[in-house]
Regions:
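Core segments of cupin and vicinal oxygen chelate
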Residues: 12-56
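Residue-level marker for the onset of beta-strands and adjacent loop->beta junctions
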Residues: 7, 37-38, 77, 102, ...
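Vicinal oxygen chelate
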Residues: 1-2, 92-136
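Mid-chain, well-packed structural core segment of small domains
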Residues: 80-92
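N-terminal beta-strand motif that seeds the catalytic metal site of vicinal oxygen chelate
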Residues: 1-17, 76-79, 83, 130-136
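Short, low-complexity disordered segments enriched in Ser/Pro/Gly and basic
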Residues: 72-74
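Short, charged/polar, Gly/Pro-enriched secondary-structure boundary elements
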Residues: 47-50, 59, 121-124
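Short, flexible, mixed-charge acidic loops at enzyme active sites
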Residues: 55-69
Length: 136
């Protein structure tokens, strides 16, 4: 047996409105659903980015889902979104146009990455296809 893919990535933030606006308006993720003060669910290609407010999910004992979250120490997450190499400069220009600070750019082999932070300090990476041997 083998897993077929990672379906969702969960991050935690008390700034749900800012995070929703950041990912939709700056990165073009698609809105799926939200529960005011608890979560925002966004679609990123063929996977989901789930943003939870840990102040709600840590005490959410009546939910059908297990209690989860991270507040102390602040949870800083890193995740990567795959982009086409042909769109690399377009993405870089879009980030600059939206005044998003690019912390680092890397080129390793044939792969290129751009690193920046979202409003909650999570490290977001835009990485070109074929960086990892997952499509083989």
């Amino acid at each position: 047996m083998k897993f077929t893919k990672i379906v969702e990535t969960c991050i935690y933030s008390t700034k749900l409105k800012e995070m929703k606006n950041f990912y939709i308006n700056n990165l073009g993720l698609d809105f799926v659903s939200e529960e005011n003060g608890r979560h925002v669910f966004l679609k990123a290609g063929k996977s989901m980015l789930l943003i939870f407010n840990p102040e709600s999910t840590l005490k959410d004992s009546n939910s059908i889902f297990p209690v989860h979250g991270a507040i102390t120490p602040p949870s800083i997450v890193h995740f990567a979104l795959e982009i086409n190499i042909e769109d690399y400069e377009k993405w870089k220009n879009l980030l600059q146009k939206n005044q998003i600070n690019i912390e680092k750019e890397l080129k390793i082999g044939n792969s290129k990455s751009i690193y920046f932070r979202d409003p909650s300090g999570n490290v977001v990476e835009l990485i070109t296809a074929n960086a990892w041997p997952v499509d083989n």
